């Protein structure tokens, strides 16, 4: 049974951000410091990545552990209230994440997914991984341009 009234639960859920979270802001700042210039939450890219480098086809997602099902089999057992709803919701999110990643890869995108806690603990390392992915795609991009 939920300890909150439906109105309290609604307010609580509405306060959960889908963009502009602290981990996203930290990664944005670190990438900017490395000279990376990105687009945020671009609706023109399937899956609406948190950060994208459209020219090089690099998409970056910062996934919250609960919402995107980190260690799902273990965490699933820990859900107490409204189990059916939450299990269905998180499993739907996991399937959607796999679909988005798969489709972007088929379309030639490099897809990086970071857990939000990993970004918080290792912001610079995550930003470096993004920079390397962009560099890898820059090299590929130049090679493809020369062949045409």
Curated annotation (Swiss-Prot):
This is Type II nicking enzyme V.NmeDIP. One of its GO terms (molecular function) is endonuclease activity. Pfam families: DUF559, Vsr. Coiled coil: none annotated. One of its GO terms (biological process) is DNA restriction-modification system. May nick NmeDI sequences that contain T/G mispairs resulting from m5C-deamination. If unrepaired, these mismatches can lead to C-to-T transition mutations. The very short patch (VSP) repair process counteracts the mutagenic process by repairing the mismatches in favor of the G-containing strand. This enzyme is an endonuclease that nicks double-stranded DNA within the sequence RTCGGB next to the thymidine residue that is mismatched to 2'-deoxyguanosine. The incision is mismatch-dependent and strand-specific. The keyword Nucleotidyltransferase does not apply. Its EC number is 3.1.-.-. It comes from the Bacteria. InterPro entries: DNA_mismatch_endonuc_vsr, DUF559, Restrct_endonuc-II-like. It comes from Neisseria meningitidis serogroup C. The gene is vsr.
């Amino acid at each position: 049974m939920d300890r909150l009234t439906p109105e309290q639960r609604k307010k609580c859920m509405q306060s959960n951000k889908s963009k502009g979270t602290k981990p996203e802001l930290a990664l944005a700042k670190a990438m900017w410091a490395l000279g990376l210039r990105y687009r945020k939450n671009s609706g023109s890219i399937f899956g609406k990545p948190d950060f994208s480098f459209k020219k090089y086809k690099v998409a970056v997602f910062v996934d919250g552990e609960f919402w995107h099902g980190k260690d799902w089999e273990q965490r699933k057992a820990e859900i107490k209230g409204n189990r059916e709803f939450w299990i269905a919701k998180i499993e739907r999110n996991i399937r959607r994440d796999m679909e988005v990643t798969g489709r972007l890869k088929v379309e030639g995108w490099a897809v990086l997914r970071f857990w939000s806690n990993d970004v918080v603990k290792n912001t610079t390392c995550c930003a470096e991984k993004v920079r390397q992915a962009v560099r890898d795609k820059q090299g590929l991009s130049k090679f493809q341009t020369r062949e045409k």
